Amino acid sequence: MGREFLGLFEEWADSYDQSVEGYDEEYREVFANYEDILNTVASKAGSVVLEFGVGTGNLTKKLLEQGKTVYGIEPSEPMRKKAREKLGDKVLIVDGDFLQFPLPPKPIDTIVSTYAFHHLTDEEKGEAIAKYSQLLKKGDKIVFADTAFRDRQAFQRAIEEARERGFHHLADDLGREYYTTLDVLTKLFKENGFTVTFTQKNAFVWVMEAVKQ
């Protein structure tokens, strides 16, 4: 369910914001256009939002600035602490993950996440989308931004290019976690009653907007 990677992200809590700001050369392209990615997800969201993988609260902050109600889910206590330092008491952030989480206290119209859905296997992604379909009504949305690839060949090329550039942490990350392809995501959303569109934001990250039918 993604929690097998929790230790890595608890170690990353103190330096995550430096990484997204481009100070980590290996991940610079992964986080290229980061502000635009956050703004795009926030602007596509409705008024009452469930956010998975809050992290240090960067997307949450954008959502709040746009006047949205946000219920945050984050499995890492160090990350929750960082988010609370950034956001104060403006938002409720609770322990949970993509598959096991407390239900929000009021109906939601959008589920969002950035840079996190790849912690789930493709099978778990399908389970998660099925759960979310039960929480959403017709016209409601799932808006995720995450690393994904057009096809398996593009995925393999990305790993090979990272190795060639000496970006071994990035290459290991791409090989270790559960990054997927657009055709797999399209199938999973369609099977659970969504239409989905994809917009590429950098060499790695796509914004996926799935609308409940």
From Swiss-Prot:
Keywords linked to the UniProt accession: Methyltransferase, S-adenosyl-L-methionine, Transferase
Transmembrane segment boundaries: none
GO molecular function terms listed in the Swiss-Prot or TrEMBL record: rRNA (adenine-N6,N6-)-dimethyltransferase activity
EC class name: transferase
Enzyme Commission code: 2.1.1.-
Pfam families from the UniProt entry: Methyltransf_25
Statement: the UniProt record of this protein carries the keyword Hydrolase: no
Domain of life according to the entry: Bacteria
Binding residue positions for S-adenosyl-L-methionine: 53, 74, 97
InterPro entries reported in the protein's UniProt record: Methyltransf_25 (IPR041698), rRNA_Ade_methylase_Trfase_N (IPR020598), SAM-dependent_MTases_sf (IPR029063), Uncharacterised_MeTfrase_YrrT (IPR023553)
HAMAP family per record: Methyltr_YrrT
Purpose: Could be a S-adenosyl-L-methionine-dependent methyltransferase.
Entry similarity comment: Belongs to the methyltransferase superfamily. YrrT family.
Entry protein name: Uncharacterized methyltransferase GWCH70_2477
Origin species: Geobacillus sp. (strain WCH70)
